[in-house]
């Protein structure tokens, strides 16, 4: 396949912000890592734009099974790696670019049996890798206080205590096992949404999915891994879909670009102060009217892009970049 050829027209997934992403990181060449392969939209876009090779990472083995039909067309230009993007520096080094799309794959949302959607009935699962405790395990065993904490900090759900109380009361009668069962329970705790507002269960499902898959830990570790894996001049592009993860990415890049400030601005810059990234866009890039018309899913998406400098990789405190802190403990 030609390096400049457009992605195949039968692509079932519309990658969010692909056009502005490719424009922001142009020219595309060398070795890139797509840390959230999903349906392969970004990978195909990068290969079509001129990447010599893309290392595609996904924790869900089904993603690679579904891509097998078209992936072979790219030969050794496409390398598939089952795993998590927080370990990308174990899979590759001296990368020319890293792309992370933090949204849920449309493939996973479309499969009722994966348990991500409150619009389709299925087992209350939500595991991206299909390993470890499921959302049903969490909902049916966590304490009321822990459930409220997760819903509030991970989903920014103001009615977290009310919903947690309802969950504990309901599961005392019978286990909560399906997506629609949980969605109906959440709906019963909240006012009916006005036209144009999101489904009442949106925030609760987001919070539980994040908890089940340790998504904030994965994002924090992934940003640090990208810093280690990128070569000087390498580009990092991250697409976020809600305020908490965007805040984490924004603060991380600001801190690593030296915008968190030195103790004394007149003091000489030290090796420790040297920025690891240069911001390629001061503000997040959002969808234009054309993309919103083509793909309503893009309405909340934000893209942030940065360039890796030659400063040594370092460490960052998770709390300092706005990672939610649960009372019971993660980071």
Curated annotation (Swiss-Prot):
- Sequence similarity: Belongs to the methyltransferase superfamily. RsmH family.
Reactions accelerated catalytically: cytidine(1402) in 16S rRNA + S-adenosyl-L-methionine = N(4)-methylcytidine(1402) in 16S rRNA + S-adenosyl-L-homocysteine + H(+)
Q: Where is it mainly found?
A: cytoplasm
A biological-process GO annotation = rRNA base methylation
Enzyme Commission (EC) number: 2.1.1.199
What is the official name of this protein in its record? Ribosomal RNA small subunit methyltransferase H
Gene3D superfamilies the UniProt entry points to: Putative methyltransferase TM0872, insert domain (1.10.150.170), Vaccinia Virus protein VP39 (3.40.50.150)
Q: Which UniProt keywords apply?
A: Cytoplasm, Methyltransferase, rRNA processing, S-adenosyl-L-methionine, Transferase
Could you give a GO molecular-function term held by this entry? rRNA (cytosine-N4-)-methyltransferase activity
UniProt: S-adenosyl-L-methionine binding residues? 40-42, 58, 85, 101, 108
Question: Where is it found, in Gene Ontology cellular component terms?
Answer: cytoplasm
InterPro entries documented for this protein: RsmH, SAM-dep_MeTrfase_MraW_recog, SAM-dependent_MTases_sf
Q: What class of enzyme is it?
A: transferase
Q: Where does the record say this protein resides?
A: Cytoplasm
Question: What is its biological role?
Answer: Specifically methylates the N4 position of cytidine in position 1402 (C1402) of 16S rRNA.
Record carries keyword Nucleus: no
């Amino acid at each position: 396949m030609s390096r400049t050829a457009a992605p195949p027209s039968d692509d079932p997934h519309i990658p969010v912000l692909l056009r502005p992403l490719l424009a922001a990181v142009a020219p595309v060449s060398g070795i890139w890592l797509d840390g959230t392969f999903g349906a392969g939209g970004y990978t195909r876009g990068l290969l079509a734009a001129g990447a010599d090779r893309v290392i595609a990472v996904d924790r869900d083995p089904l993603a690679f099974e579904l891509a097998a039909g078209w992936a072979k067309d790219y030969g050794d230009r496409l390398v598939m790696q089952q795993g998590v993007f927080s370990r990308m520096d174990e899979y590759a080094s001296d990368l020319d670019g890293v792309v992370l799309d933090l949204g849920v794959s449309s493939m996973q949302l479309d499969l009722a049996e994966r348990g991500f959607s409150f619009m389709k009935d299925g087992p209350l699962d939500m595991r991206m890798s299909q390993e470890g405790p499921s959302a049903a395990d969490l909902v049916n065993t966590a304490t009321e206080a822990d459930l409220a904490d997760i819903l509030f900090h991970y989903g920014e759900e103001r009615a977290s205590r009310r919903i947690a109380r309802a969950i504990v009361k309901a599961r005392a009668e019978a286990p909560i096992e399906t997506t629609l069962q949980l969605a109906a329970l959440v709906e019963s705790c909240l006012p009916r949404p006005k036209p144009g507002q999101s489904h009442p269960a949106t925030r609760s499902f987001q919070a539980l999915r994040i908890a089940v898959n340790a998504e904030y830990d994965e994002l924090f570790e992934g940003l640090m891994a990208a810093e280690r894996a990128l070569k000087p001049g390498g580009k990092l592009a991250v697409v976020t879909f809600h305020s908490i993860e965007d805040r984490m990415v924004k603060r991380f890049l600001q801190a690593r670009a030296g915008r968190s400030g030195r103790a004394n601005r007149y003091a000489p810059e030290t090796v420790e102060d040297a920025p690891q990234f240069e911001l390629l866009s001061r503000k997040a890039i959002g969808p234009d009217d054309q993309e919103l018309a083509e793909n309503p899913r893009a309405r909340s998406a934000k893209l942030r892009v940065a360039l890796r400098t030659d400063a040594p990789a370092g460490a960052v405190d998770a709390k300092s970049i706005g990672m939610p802190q649960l009372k019971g403990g993660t980071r």
